């Protein structure tokens, strides 16, 4: 959930009902949670959880934007019974089950190197280079960067004036930025690979992976606001067929 309301982690109770166990299983959460994905990032057979936020990935933008968190927020969470939230991507690593059946997740987003990707929406875990590890693709961008401190001052000064909400929104900077891809290098570490995908600034939201041309590697389809969709062709098998592993299954029936 975005901002005040906490994220929810519904665990199947085995009796046809689900119960929110986020407070027990997760030590803390992303604050302005956007998209999420669940995948086994370290190939231990257990599902890990990634939730995206909107923390800038460069120093200049970070200092130019509203952080969204201070001690008053922290104290408010304590006072009103909310779980603690921080404005960055969270990667919750599944540590297996303890004696009472609880899943003790560890949050490792900063350790893994994927905690800051700017205003992000859809994360996709997928083995993009066919090496057996799940890599990460993240969509980015927003038509109006309402985190910008100059814009927040303009909005505050316009209170009580005849300036319309539409006019104010059009004053916000356009956050048209490239999407991001990370290579899973093993040992719970990810490395940003700008050479894997051409850096095209966009307002990208939804995305999906599929082997569109049946060549054995996963392509990516990205949906954009006010622009054409992207189809990102994966050339892993084409460029390095000897170092690429995949399984092709052909079904043969009686008819």
Q: Which functions belong to the PLM regions below?
A:
Residues 1-255:
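Acidic, glycine/proline-rich Ca2+-coordinating loop motifs
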